[in-house]
Amino acid sequence: MSFDTDQDADGIALGVPDWVAYELRRDEWAGGKSHKRPSRWSTDPDLHQRGIAPDDSSYRNSGYSRGHMCMKSHAAGMGAAADRETHTVLNACPQMQRMNGGIWLAIEYLTGRWANEQGAVWIVTGPVFTEASRNWIGDLYRLLMPVLTGSEEVAARR
């Protein structure tokens, strides 16, 4: 989670992951299949109470979707618990559904295919924000989260 993104000690919390990193092996790629999605996204109650992390309601009626940083079906091959643990707001960034179900999804499938072809890949994913087009969701008096305008994903072979 981002607690102070510009390292100037002003304590700006963005409420989204700075990045996620994980290894995806050939035998773990579920080919887009995953376990049943829970009806609500979980959060860390302590971080939410402190105004550092969002909760499921932060996205409600925002017009934005919760974009997984670690793809749900990437984790599905690691087991039901890993699959379920991707369904937390600590693993999500607000984004337009057009991006989430479009280029973002295509990149997630591409890295899964690379894991099949190469045997394993390390994946590092993080949000990109631009000042000019920054939109926010959440509670003005609690925690505002920026809507990402892009993402960076690096995949490297073992």
Predicted stretch roles:
Residues 40, 47-158:
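Domain-level detector of nuclease and nuclease-like folds
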